[in-house]
Curated annotation (Swiss-Prot):
Keywords: Cell membrane, Membrane, Protein transport, Translocation, Transmembrane, Transmembrane helix, Transport. Its main location: membrane. This is Protein translocase subunit SecY. It holds the Pfam family SecY. GO terms for biological process: protein transport. It is found in: Cell membrane. The central subunit of the protein translocation channel SecYEG. Consists of two halves formed by TMs 1-5 and 6-10. These two domains form a lateral gate at the front which open onto the bilayer between TMs 2 and 7, and are clamped together by SecE at the back. The channel is closed by both a pore ring composed of hydrophobic SecY resides and a short helix (helix 2A) on the extracellular side of the membrane which forms a plug. The plug probably moves laterally to allow the channel to open. The ring and the pore may move independently. InterPro entries: SecY, SecY/SEC61-alpha, SecY_CS, SecY_dom_sf. HAMAP family: SecY (MF_01465). The chain crosses the membrane at residues 24-44, 77-97, 125-145, 154-174, 183-203, 217-237, 274-294, 317-337. Component of the Sec protein translocase complex. Heterotrimer consisting of SecY, SecE and SecG subunits. The heterotrimers can form oligomers, although 1 heterotrimer is thought to be able to translocate proteins. Interacts with the ribosome. Interacts with SecDF, and other proteins may be involved. Interacts with SecA. GO terms for cellular component: plasma membrane. It is a multi-pass membrane protein.
């Protein structure tokens, strides 16, 4: 029976409709994320907080604010961002390697993956509560920031903790919905949206500087070329892969005979993707932020020294950041690609690699 051309058109049309729905869902979710980043925690003076963030330019707090899409500078319910979830993911994935019970759960396939995801949610809740308590108790005690909290007390602490924890758990749920109903990894998309939220104002400010003559046009052109070149290089590396030739011998199943086939096993150059950089940022941000919040308290002056050493650009920060990225590159690649498991699967399917 001849294949009708109209069927291909209907199939393609249905595929485009599904893609459109997924894109619209992602756009809608990001709009909700941006709206939520403007909903403030009750009881905080936004003008005093803006002065605080102005004093913290170039510090770890500004970096934390960037990851939250500016939510921290507005004392938003999304101020914690998605970082507690990332930290919990790191802890759970490390435990799956060193803890035999979790290692067995991981081998259970889809059911095991759901259990691991559930454990990650519990870990996110615990870390979010811990971090929100730290922020709620640290804000009223920050030196030189009198009036930041209008009415400090139990009511403010309770409201702030509930708001921050709820915001983080909602972002985690939103990221999972984007992964399921949208396109790509939802958590990565939320992080990306938070980072690029400050891009349009920065571009507009740069163009205005060039228009007024404060910035030379050739320098602006050079920056644009560098941005394009870096983007091209990142995409080139991300799409790069090593193709291992895999052959299937002639085989018979029942009455059907399958001819010998040759295909390839694609191994990405960068299997870990951007995950190591995100994990490394999360690992450094957590202690540095705690040190920055509590460093001004009595008896906690040593935390101020720690926070200064962990500022972006400091030698210790660069060393720890680079070391963490290298570690998570190896660690995450070992998680997503198991050579022994891949070899067993190839053997079970009757495939072999020539010369091995």
């Amino acid at each position: 029976m001849a294949k009708q051309p109209g069927l291909d058109f209907q199939s393609a049309k249905g595929g485009l409709g599904e893609l459109k729905r997924r894109l619209l869902f992602v756009i809608g979710a990001l709009i909700v994320f941006r709206i939520g980043s403007f909903i403030p925690i009750p009881g905080i003076d936004a003008t005093v907080l803006a002065k605080l963030l102005e004093q913290q330019r170039g510090t770890i707090i500004e970096m934390f604010n960037m990851f939250s899409g500016g939510a921290l500078s507005r004392a938003s319910i999304f101020a914690l961002g998605i970082m507690p979830y990332i930290s919990a993911s790191i802890i759970i994935q490390l435990l799956t390697v060193v803890h035999p019970a979790l290692a067995e759960v991981k081998k259970e396939g889809e059911a095991g993956r759901r259990k691991i995801s559930q454990y990650t949610r519990y870990g996110t809740l615990v870390l979010a509560i811990f971090q929100s308590i730290g922020i709620a108790t640290g804000l009223p005690n920050m030196p030189g920031m009198q009036g930041l909290v209008m009415n400090p007390g139990f009511a403010f602490y309770f409201t702030a903790v509930v708001s921050l924890v709820t915001g983080t758990m909602f972002l985690m749920w939103l990221g999972e919905q984007i992964t399921e109903r949208g396109i790509g990894n939802g958590i990565s998309i939320i992080i990306f949206a938070g980072i690029v939220a400050g891009l349009p104002p920065a571009v507009a400010h740069t163009i205005e500087q060039a228009r007024q003559g404060d910035l030379h046009f050739l320098l602006l052109l050079l920056v644009a070329v560098l941005v394009f070149a870096v983007t091209f290089f990142v995409v080139f590396i991300e799409r790069g892969q090593r193709r291992i030739v895999v052959n299937y011998a002639k085989r018979q199943q029942g009455r059907r005979v399958y001819a010998a086939q040759s295909t390839h096993l694609p191994l990405k150059v960068n299997m870990a993707g951007v995950i190591p950089a995100i994990f490394a940022s999360s690992i450094i941000l957590f202690p540095a932020t705690i040190a920055s919040w509590f460093g001004g308290g009595t008896g906690w002056n040593w935390l101020t020294t720690v926070s200064l050493y962990l500022q972006p650009g400091q030698p210790l920060y660069v060393l720890l950041y680079a070391s963490a990225i290298i570690f998570f590159c190896f660690f995450y690649t070992a998680l997503v690609f198991n050579p022994r498991e891949t070899a067993d699967n190839l053997k079970k399917s009757g495939a072999f690699v020539p010369g091995i």
